Amino acid sequence: MKYINDFEDKNIEFHLKKVDSSFNLQIENETLINYLLSLNMNRESRILNSNEFGEFVSPISFQHGLSGYLFYLSHMRDISENGRIIEWIISEGNQNKGNVYLNGCSILFGSSGYLWVLLEFYKKITSNNPSRELIIDKIRDIYKDLISSYQKVEVFDFALGKSGILLSLMKYCINFNDVDSMEFIREKIEELYLYFVDEIRNVNSLKECNFAHGLAGIAYVILIYNSEFEFKVAYENSIKVFNNLLENLLENEYSRLNATPTNLELSWCEGTSGILLYFELLYDKRYSNIISRFQQLAFKFNLIQSSCYCHGLSSLLQTLNYQDKLNLRENVIEILLSRSKRDKNGILVFECEESSDTLFDFGIGNLGIYWSILGERFPFELKKEL
């Protein structure tokens, strides 16, 4: 047994909580999956309730809705023959025709995230499965809509904007070997590159370089295009300039972050964990030392961090899934388990966003926490052989 400092729901009062390290997380995961697959989709195309913001965005959202559920389930179990999954996909299509949502094309909150997940699902469906054509039709419809809606998207970032959409379109191109989509991607990547080069000339802070809403996510998408589709020296050089800039910004911010960081400054979406993940996705050992230093820094301030994937401690754990640092990884898992309990359905649930343990959304709830604990890698990693 270990004792770890934890904090109660909405109070800033610390207490000691005993952690039972005998949890079999694979069994806990099976219990979670069985529960999810027992659920029906409601009239709003939701499987379970989200938080206030999650109820406002599209129910197919990766961050808050169906896409996150499907992605998790398709990686944790063979669900290609599961009738409940097909029911969800059919119900969503019948109920969401014509609906318009905030950031409705984005990879975290909209249809490009759904495209990404359906492409994952499609790869696992056998050719004689009667649902295969349904999935293909859905994929092609989303692809066409994204192409026609792309220019209406006003931002370039990964979570909300054009770079995240382009990553999903690249995945579509890999799966369907589509010449027209390749031409579209080539043109739009050049536009993204020109924006990126202009932005890195004017960077003044680490916050501008975060993964979800800043330049690291854009750099990642350009990097994927350059390594998997069409190499350009100019693209490679711009990435090198950005990486050097990012290293310098991290070094300059280390002392301040080592004294008074905020939760978001350590997170995936807006902080250091997202930047460390970006460095890990380069698969370049030269960044090992800086990754290690900032992982230790983030762990030092575990008490100010929530537990979830997007904004909390699970984003640090995601970076540790790329590193051979077993002790630190186990320590983070111990802390997350110290924030867990058994719910009325017998599921091991974790304190999530806003101190709630009832959220299952991938981005802010239990699915993302389980994902990191079970050692999985970044959901949006892309290679042709994958």
Tell me the role of every PLM-derived stretch:
Residues 1-35, 224, 281, 286, ...:
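Terminal, non-catalytic domain-edge segments
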Residues 27-46, 78-101, 134-153, 184-204, ...:
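Long, well-ordered core segments of solenoidal/helical folds
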Residues 10-65, 71-86, 190:
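Low-complexity, Ser/Thr/Pro/Gly-enriched N-terminal "stalk/linker" regions
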Residues 121-128, 172-183, 225-236, 282-285:
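Inter-helical turn/loop segments and adjacent helix faces that build the functional surface
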Residues 59-74, 105-122, 157-171, 207-224, ...:
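Well-ordered alpha-helical segments within folded domains of soluble proteins
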Residues 238-266, 272-273, 279:
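Active-site cradle of extracellular carbohydrate-active enzymes
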Residues 26-30, 43-50, 106, 132, ...:
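Mature, well-folded catalytic/scaffold domains that follow N-terminal targeting or propeptide regions
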